[in-house]
Amino acid sequence: MPQDVRFDLPFETPVSKHLESARARHLRWVWEMRLVHSREGFEEYRSWDLPQAAARTYPHASADDMVVLMNWFSLAFLFDDQFDASRPDRADRIAEVARELIVTPLRPAGTPPRVACPITLAWTEVWKHLSHGMSLTWQSRFAASWGRFLEAHCEEVDLAARGLEGTLGLVEFTEFRRRTVGIHHSIDAGERSRGFEVPAQAMAHPVMERMRDLAADTIGFMNDIHSFEREKRRGDGHNLIAVLRRERGCSWQEATDEAYRMTIARLDEYLELQERVPQMCDELRLDEAQRDGVRLGVEAIQHWINGNYEWALTSGRYAAAKEGAVATAELAGRGSVDDLLTV
């Protein structure tokens, strides 16, 4: 089964020692912020085990910061599931909420949202903590990556609302997937989790830019493989395996094998570029402190590639079968048990 597909990743990453204590605080917060309304929705959310994802991708965060990062994961993942195929007009509300999420980092931290719902209220609180202590340069970079991700999500929802979800060709899809996977700003958050910043000149270098793109591709493709059963069950055509099968007229297994090959190719190219990082630092004439920032930035990418992979192998989010209210919601074309876009 796709969720069981294994990759031989060349690096291991730690898991935060704060996982269990932060998990308890986080789950209370999710309920208090009404990011889940029902017992069924809460149990489904718990099965995803997003706290493990945060603990693996940001293993060096402090106890308090780990809770903030878990909280951020919750609102982002839950917002991703808000489209309802039986209500195409839902796309307009999603776009309205997405615009609010995009502009929040551009306002003074803590400014109440103009569009109020559980998702925007939660993001306002999270951003106040997530941005604390970071430079305007970092905040602007994060906001740009976050905005591109949310805009791409709206494009995806709009395609689904118009019945065009499965119409992208492979080249177009892979470029689109790089934006919808939401990895660039997630790697940026790795800097916040350890209290450092990658020098701006390194971030602008073609080697670092390509490494981040390849990391996004690698993670996005692995995610498409591991989530395939869930997305096939929901009729979601925004998946690499589905695109390959449609474009090449092959079997599901052949499409899965090709998706695996494409993932390995992206990972191999990433590893080749990673070996060129010292040369990049020499070229930019970085001092020791700046080189440390680059080194930690590369570790942040590794934490995301390996941490997300390890989490996806066991997360209930990608389980092959669902029961009860969750199964009913999926059969009705809803991605979520609870509506989080209204007050």
UniProtKB/Swiss-Prot annotation:
Protein known as: 7-epi-alpha-eudesmol synthase ((2E,6E)-farnesyl diphosphate cyclizing)
Record-marked site positions (Plays a critical role in the stabilization of intermediate cation): F77
Entry GO MF terms: metal ion binding; terpene synthase activity
Sequence positions that bind Mg(2+) 1: D80, D84
This protein's record includes keyword Lyase: yes
Plays a critical role for substrate recognition, annotated site positions: D81, E156
Reactions the enzyme catalyzes: (2E,6E)-farnesyl diphosphate + H2O = 7-epi-alpha-eudesmol + diphosphate
Pathway assigned in UniProt: Secondary metabolite biosynthesis; terpenoid biosynthesis
Cofactor: Mg(2+)
Family, similarity comment: Belongs to the terpene synthase family.
Protein's job: Catalyzes the conversion of (2E,6E)-farnesyl diphosphate (FPP) to yield the bicyclic sesquiterpenol 7-epi-alpha-eudesmol via a 1,10-cyclization, which requires the abstraction of the pyrophosphate from FPP to yield the (E,E)-germacradienyl cation. The only accepted substrate is (2E,6E)-farnesyl diphosphate (FPP).
Source organism per UniProt: Streptomyces viridochromogenes (strain DSM 40736 / JCM 4977 / BCRC 1201 / Tue 494)
UniProt keyword list: Lyase, Magnesium, Metal-binding
